[in-house]
Regions:
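Active-site beta-strand/loop signature of hydrolases that rely on acidic residues for catalysis
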Residues: 16-17, 32-50, 116, 146-171, ...
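Structured beta-strand-rich core segments of catalytic domains in phosphoester-bond hydrolases
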Residues: 45-48, 52-128
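Conserved beta strand-loop-helix elements of the APE1-like EEP
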Residues: 71-86, 231-253, 279
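N-terminal, active-site-proximal structural segment of metallo-dependent hydrolase catalytic domains
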Residues: 2-62, 72-75, 191
């Protein structure tokens, strides 16, 4: 395992939908070199656990906890230090459920125990889809159950990941006509019922870190479609659907949060940008 940089006071958290981690190791190295994260939540690792690139991650100075499957889905938590506890999956999931959630508790010298829950939330496709939309409903319901039964809002909790919902209209950058068409056709990402599911997370006690620091920002997005070259267009066309949500104790320590466009501009990038937040003890 590589030697991590000396521990500094702030805790840096990154969430990154890699769209295949083995294809994005160059992006991972870039964000590690530039942002020096303590914990990285990976979504869409798209690799079964036995084929995960543990050696490559160790060379970057990180320990990996994984919950993956072949070809689709998959999540992981990469960290400078091993977590105290790890859990995988959601309450009442079937044994063959899609591998979409992993959580771990870390001991930070300044902040104390910090629990990071990392998820690749279902996209849902369309409210009329017979399986994908109900799967998205169930995922949000089970996540709420997890929070309500295992945690309290007074703890240091971070829920991070590709949440596949644009919470407010400022998170939508696909053009007014497309926005209206998506709503008219029932296409997922910002349907009223989806926003209601996300609101339950906020009601429990979580806050969107980026929106907290940038309340009126409407020109920064985390996902850009490959086919329409949304990242290359001017203005850029995308959605902000990757989030780092913090409980109130963590929110009080939040100092910075942003979206990393530099990684998205690299060759052979994921369609998602890494996002990050910094917490000072």
């Amino acid at each position: 395992m590589g030697t991590p940089k000396p521990r500094k006071q702030p805790m840096n958290i990154i969430s990154f939908n890699t769209n295949s981690i083995r294809m994005r190791l160059h992006q991972l190295k870039s964000i590690i070199d530039r942002l020096d994260p303590d914990v990285i939540g990976i979504q869409e690792s798209k690799v079964c656990d036995e084929d995960f690139p543990f050696d490559d991650i160790a060379e970057l100075g990180y320990h990996a906890e994984v919950h993956g499957q072949k070809t689709h889905y998959g999540v992981a938590l990469l960290s400078k230090t091993k977590p105290e506890q790890v859990f995988k999956g959601l309450p009442d999931e079937a044994g063959d459920a899609q591998r979409r959630l992993i959580g771990a508790a870390y001991q930070d010298p300044k902040l104390g125990k910090v629990t990071v829950i990392n998820g690749y939330f279902p996209q849902g496709e369309n409210r009329n889809h017979p399986t994908k939309f109900p799967n998205k409903v169930a995922f949000y319901e089970r996540l709420n159950l997890l929070l309500e039964t295992r945690f309290t809002p007074s703890e240091n909790i971070l829920v991070i990941g590709d949440m596949n919902i644009a919470s407010v209209d400022e998170d939508i950058g696909i053009g007014a006509d497309n926005q209206k068409r998506w709503l008219r056709e029932g296409k997922t990402s910002f349907l009223p019922e989806e926003r209601a599911w996300q609101q339950k997370l906020y009601d429990w006690g979580l806050t969107d870190t980026y929106r907290h620091l940038h309340p009126s920002g409407n020109d920064r997005f985390s996902w850009f479609d490959y086919r329409s070259k949304g990242f290359e267009r001017e203005p850029r066309r995308g959605l902000r659907i990757d989030l780092i949500l913090a409980s109130q104790p963590m929110l009080k320590k939040l100092t910075k949060a942003d979206i990393d466009y530099e990684a998205r501009a690299m060759v052979k990038p994921s369609d998602h940008c890494p996002i990050w937040a910094t917490f000072k003890g």
